[in-house]
Amino acid sequence: MSRGHNIKKSLTPQISCSTSESYKQLDFLPDKLRAKLLPFQKDGITFALRRDGRCMVADEMGLGKTVQAIGIAYFYKEEWPLLIVVPSSLRYPWTEEIEKWIPELSPEEINVIQNKTDVGRISTSKVTVLGYGLLTTDAETLIDALNNQNFKVVIVDESHYMKSRSATRSRILLPIVQKAKRAILLTGTPALGRPEELFMQIEALFPQKFGTWTEYAKRYCNAHVRYFGRRSQWDCRGASNLNELHQLLSDIMIRRLKTEVLTQLPPKIRQRIPFDLPSAAAKELNSSFEEWEKLMRDPYSGATETVMGLITRMFKQTAIAKAGAVKDYIKMMLQNDSLKFLVFAHHLSMLQACTEAVIENKTRYIRIDGSVPSSERIHLVNQFQKDPETRVAILSIQAAGQGLTFTAATHVVFAELYWDPGHIKQAEDRAHRIGQCSSVNIHYLIANGTLDTLMWGMLNRKAQVTGSTLNGRKEKLQAEEGDKEKWDFLQFAEAWTPNERSEELRDEMLFTHFEKEKQRDIRSFFLPNAKKRQLETSCDESRVSQEKNTIVPADPVKTATRGDESDLEPEAKKLKSVAIDDPCRPPEEQPCRPGQAEALLTFGICKAKAQATTPAFCGEGWQCAFCTYINNSVLPYCEMCENPRGGAVPQIDSLNQTQNKNKNEKDDSQDTSKKIQTSSDGEKQVLAHSTPEPLAKSKEEISTTESEDRLTPQPGDEQLKNWPVYDTLMFCASKNTDRIHVYTKDGNQMNCNFIPLDIKLDLWEDLPASFQLKQNRSLILRFVREWSSLTAMKQKIIKKSGQLFRSPVLALEEIAKQQTKQNSTKRYITKEDVAAASMDKVKNDGGHVRLITKGPKPGDPSTKEFLEGGECVPFLNPCTAQGDLILKASTSKGYLQAVDNEGNPLCLRCQQPTCQTKQERKADAWDSRFCSLKCQEEFWIRSNNSYLRAKVFEIEHGVCQLCNLNAQELFLRLRDAPKSQRKSLLDATWTSKLPLEQLNEMIRSPGEGHFWQVDHIKPVSGGGGQCSLDNLQTLCTVCHRERTAQQAKERSQVRRQSLASNHGSDITRFLVKK
């Protein structure tokens, strides 16, 4: 039965670019977005509007589907709230795009859902961003909140995630999309390999339009009964009537190819690299092939699971067999120093082999697989895009093959193939997309006599099916075969063995006592003691630091003053060049000593320990005639008041008036600082003590200031009259991106935002034309200078506060004042502490307590006494029951929670009622632990070490805050290196002075905890326990050992003084003048 007669004839999706009337509908868009859209993108928006906002935008990857979806959703903004469903790794890039193109949205109006219980802001936010990973069967609280919100406009990015009818996320999303009035589905590969993958997406947009699933499968999937032995199965993996399906899809789907609408984009050149494997490498694979051939001769001899399991095993064996050749190929490509390229693989074993090749070549790289957190992936992408020293990106086809941009690469290498052409094309177009300026060469490494040859044929057959369905014509992966003689060296590659299969560590692979007790560095005999040397050379270091800053101004974040850093410097760092990575500093500007070439080659950049001194101007600066501030000699304007160098001395009255004005502005800034959201709990002393001092401008700011008049277009008199002049501005930092939103001094939104790094690079396109005026521009420059002087942790504290502020430094002080002082000598909150707080709350205010657990096992005696089916335990006698309840709560897997007299469960953190007022299901009790995401985060930071490390790593990325060493990168390099090379890698770095057992443990089983720790700025012994993020910092292992030893020494001195005071008086008291 054909459904074609029941569907209206398709409107032509390709709207003429010359028809200006078609674009009049787009006048509603923000000016910046409308000016940025390309003609075919405007056609896509018009196509959706003609279909009342329900369609699929299926443009090929890299054609800008995101901005089209934002434009469509903006047309229906009166019908918001808007729900955006994306892969988990794309939540923050989507938030960045929303803030960029719709600047009228304030930061608090965009909600990025963090976990399955983060539902507090769904009902109040205009835009909600949700990751596919949270749509699981146990996310009942989240699913209920999404259904109750009744979203009228929904965007589903990478909608092919809904391809499976049986997947949980497909069943959850289907009713939400169907119920929405407007629904935009985005995907570059609607069908990855078969027509059956289209049905759920079509059903979400237009239910029953293509009939039931059975009707659709029979008509377009060639559905039939297939027998495996004696068992029958309904097979829907085929394809039929594809031309008819293509015609029907054109009514609800618009699809353009890059070759049709983006002809100026450089071409994509595919090439197959076939090679033969050495017989030793393919030994296991050959035996599996023989087993597979036996099954194929007698199809009744094995079940489907046996066949599929064998194919999966052969797939992995193919990866291991060709890994040695892949390593040699990558090393060959690395011989070209100017080449940046991507390497895609599927199995972890192949990813490991590719990583080893890069490490052995001593090249800087990034690696993204399923274990890398979503927030860290964006950081790694930016590193590859902007750092010229990072030449290779090793990527998982599934984890990094969608949504990310790697246009800095000109070559793509597929170390492995995958099962469908959709994933392959998605991975190809990470580099071949808008923004690519060079042709992209794609190399497929095909090992003859392996599963590769079969998979290549299968990929081309599937490509013909998807091409006929989506594009109306048969297609295949056009790839020319490379010169076989050119790649003959691959067949002589050595067989590769994964680390887990490698032989036991031999003695020569570990450090020994003899090596650790080798002679001291001869230079140490000619140097005084560390503290004496520090005093003698402090002036010289300051002068050298000032000279360095004069030539190449350093990053203000990395040159922040730390008074006790020299005391904590380990001997290994004083006598030996360390290999650390500083992407912001060119390699030619980083000092290297002779004899440290190995360290330089191993870690890419050789850099001396960062000097932590306050810039001192020993007579070489110039004094401002306006404010008398002594500036660096290279600055053309005063750093404090923006007065030009050499300017006339102002009149006294004018000076006094200006000073009074500045004083009033400072007072106003403290009075008018507006609180949008309460800040996190923490220690005022830490923030107040660590407020940064003014630092010298960075190179970008200097160049911006010097060339301001030259680069800024000179407006006419009429424009000058129309542009407003601001004497002060207010700012709000986005919680989820790097953008800063701009407000007037009255707190009114200016509908614009910017990224501080763009301003430092003299990119002002995100700000209105009125910021061409020097007075307006100076306000932004001053903010960027202060913001850049803060550490990443302090910036995060301001972001979390949600405050409106004039100065980030003053905002940090305000946050410190608002925080309650808390002193605790306990490192973490325990279950006993929670139980005691709950019992005290009930004792004082009434109510009862209950023990909440996550999925308690039936018949568990530890929970039966307190909890039956999620019910509460009434509070009886606090004098007799408290001790027993607390004891049993500490030994169980749950928490003792207080419930008030009205039946509302109270938050474990703040003892306030949570958002869950009525518990109807067992799962709700566990989800009602916290009243908000803020309380949940604060509780886990204070009680869970793994969560604490993850949050600090998200901000500081494993970089030591004392010596600026990238300890996380060293850990990844050592973890991914062959075991035989780990010893030499460690011996060339700062870790060489660590204890013997610790070094050998790093070689045997390296872990993050061996390389960096999360340290309390105010120590736990001094009352800094159970703290928030503001009292935490990342330290490498050497700095942490030194700081811990110093603190132990100080505590010992305090104890001795306290003991001595019990038996006598301090003699220094007699020397004090009365």
UniProtKB/Swiss-Prot annotation:
Segments carrying motif APIM motif: 1069-1073
Segments forming domain HNH: 1006-1046
Annotated binding of ATP, by residue: 59-66
GO annotations of cellular component type: nuclear replication fork
Similarity-based family: Belongs to the SNF2/RAD54 helicase family.
Other known facts: In contrast to classical helicases that unwing DNA, annealing helicases rewind it.
Protein name listed in UniProt: DNA annealing helicase and endonuclease ZRANB3
Naturally occurring in which organism (per UniProt): Bos taurus
Gene name of the encoded protein: ZRANB3
